[in-house]
Amino acid sequence: MNDVKKDPVELVLCDMDGTLLLPDHTLSPRTFEAVKSLQDAGIHFTLASGRPPKAMREIIKQLDIQLPFAGFNGGLLVNAQGEYLQSHHVHPEAVRKTLDLLAGHKVEVWLFVEDDWLLRDPHGEMVEHEQQGLGYAPQVVESFEPYLHQVHKIVATCNDAPLLMSLEQRLQPLLKGLAVASRSQARYLDITALEANKGNALVTLAEYLDVPLARTVAIGDGGNDPAMFRRAGFSVAMGQAPEEVRAQAQVVTGSNIEDGVAQAIDRFIL
């Protein structure tokens, strides 16, 4: 193990998109083998993502992960049998405030209610890309009104990254004490429950597995990942992560197209 990391590692919590996965949402052979090496060494490995659990299950299956995993940035904690261990909905007032603000901007707005992906415009330019990533189709609804009390995540998305950054900065004070707004990727602004962040997910998973936080590692690339960086014993940012994300990790590995997760496992964990 590299001398940067002092405590033996018992649990690795890893982001998916932009971290574990290649840009085409697949696992590289090198990363697959590195995760298997971790598991063979008796080190727990599981995932935390902004995705709904349904969109995580194929990778969970490929890696034979038998541990609970966190969807919606920790909004849903799910065990290997698909049972919910924790479920956090976005406060209805936060949902309404968010929808009201976003209505005045050229962004696509999606709601996630458990595994259902709800939208009003099936022809939005981001829909096809999202469907490829999630692996299933959206449900078209006339109105979001019936779902205000059931929301696990709101997504605002478009190709205008500066607009999403501006909306994030406006939503954070607006939703203070009600919900969390963070960009999981440059083109995705997520609004999740106040309790739903990857840091809380890491703490819950560590307690579930009886692992001290000092013996945990968090790996990620997005604006929703520093929450787990701050709680983990050791934190790793991907090479292509935004500068403000890299600055909050203890070390930086290669990018996801360079098998950065495998590099981190080989260099800092095994």
Where in the sequence are the language-model features?
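Residue-level signal for inorganic ion chemistry
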Residues: 38, 49, 73, 154, ...
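Conserved acidic, metal-coordinating active-site core of Asp-based
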Residues: 105-219, 223, 227-231, 240
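Hydrophobic packing residues within well-ordered alpha-helices of enzyme cores
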Residues: 31, 56-60, 167, 171, ...
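Short, structured coil segments at secondary-structure junctions
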Residues: 63-65, 72-73, 175-177, 231-232, ...
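Asp-based phosphoryl-transfer active-site loop
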Residues: 8-23
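Mg2+-dependent phosphoryl-transfer enzymes with acidic/Ser/Thr/Gly-rich catalytic loops
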Residues: 2-11, 28, 190-270
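Short active-site oxyanion
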Residues: 42-46, 65-67, 153, 214-215, ...
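Active-site phosphate-binding/coordination module
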Residues: 24-127
